[in-house]
Amino acid sequence: MIKDKEPRKGQNGGRKSYGSEPPVVCSFCGRTSQEVNSMVAGPRAFICDRCILSSVEILRKEISAIRHPDQSPEPAFQPRLKSPVNIKEALDQYVIGQEQAKKSLAVAVYNHYKRLDAHDWSSGDEVVIEKSNILLIGPTGTGKTLLAQTLANLLEVPFTIADATSLTEAGYVGDDVETILARLLHASDFNLERAERGIIYVDEIDKIARKSANVSITRDVSGEGVQQALLKILEGSVVGVPPKGGRKHPEQQLININTKNILFICGGAFEGLDKIIARRVSKSSMGFGSKVRGKQTGYDPEILKLVTQDDLHDYGLIPEFIGRLPVMSVLEPLDAVALRNILVEPKNALVKQYKRLFEMDGVELEFTDEALERVVAIAIERGTGARALRSVLENVMIDIMFELPTRKDVQKCVITAETIDKTGGPVYEKKDGKERKIA
């Protein structure tokens, strides 16, 4: 017999009262029927769905040990922990520049997963190491998302990206914070143990800053309310998550995820934060005033490196939320040299990707130095950092990649500055040795 968590309705439509009857309690864990999804009743005992799942897992391991006595027991999931130096070296292969940010991330991630190892071996009387979530501050296209993605790949842990602008308070149109955890659960193929040691990157976190410091009669459902909702999962708590995502509803069974070991990396451009810092610094007697006043426009990483928690509070983040992000790192804007290196140097550089695609069609692809310089110049004009590089190249390469697979006589394709500017086509080298420039 199975008892649902809700008491049965009486014939008059009201709830049936237990009266003097004691509540149904699991004989193994002591949870009541109101605390679980379902309860199985025996002649003299009850067992809840959670204890059933735990029992199945225990029996599975025991049966496996009997059938395969020489096989070592299945180890608990452990991320591939590397030293900060090794972590940074791995990041260097994919992320150009941002030396200080990579060092900060390497140390923070190393300490985070070392903390998990310490917790696993803890006897209960050692110092408790708190979780160090990370805040990345930098303009769009500087590599915030790429840094987080590369870290997750390096450690071989589940990873998901959430857009803070899509989050709203529970009860309003939009995603609630549990949706983020549902995505992480999907990324781990519903392996709860892996999900609980994953990494979540929350992008555009600056967009959930309070719209105004003044109290308003209108609810800020995508600002301070979302910050409050994120607090519990940032610090660590057990959250019921709908396995299929979406909003929770009373009839839905939930998967409980403990977030205390999930690493959260939050990133945002924080436009205007440098002005808040500049005003604070200019009021001090440290001689910065004259230096700062001339830098009231544009992105100034040197000013942002002076950021404090008070500055973030003035920007619109609540103190409790700021306190959950103890590690802060400022990313540098990318100059022309860095953008050019991004095109050709990383393991998955855009130029290398296009060369590989052409190679699959039996064609060698080459970019002239002038062509790369034009790509960089156009990207700088657009002002979106490294993100503009792909859009510039894709706009140029789309017609070439459309036509080339049907050109069996071509063995080499050269992209020139004229190709990038669309004042001329690429130079094709045919298999007979002749060259042809497409107008």
Swiss-Prot record:
Please describe what this protein does: ATP-dependent specificity component of the Clp protease. It directs the protease to specific substrates. Can perform chaperone functions in the absence of ClpP.
Superkingdom: Bacteria
Q: Which GO terms describe its molecular function?
A: ATP binding; ATP hydrolysis activity; ATP-dependent protein folding chaperone; protein dimerization activity; unfolded protein binding; zinc ion binding
Domain ClpX-type ZB intervals: 14-67
Q: NCBIfam families recorded for this chain?
A: clpX, PRK05342.1
* Gene Ontology process terms (BP): cell division; proteolysis involved in protein catabolic process
Q: How does it assemble?
A: Component of the ClpX-ClpP complex. Forms a hexameric ring that, in the presence of ATP, binds to fourteen ClpP subunits assembled into a disk-like structure with a central cavity, resembling the structure of eukaryotic proteasomes.
Give the family from UniProt. Answer: Belongs to the ClpX chaperone family.
Q: Tell me which GO cellular component terms the UniProt record holds.
A: HslUV protease complex
Q: Does the keyword Transmembrane apply?
A: no
Question: Which residues hold Zn(2+)?
Answer: 26, 29, 48, 51
Q: What is this protein called?
A: ATP-dependent Clp protease ATP-binding subunit ClpX
Q: Which UniProt keywords apply?
A: ATP-binding, Chaperone, Metal-binding, Nucleotide-binding, Zinc
Q: Does the record carry Cell division as a key word?
A: no
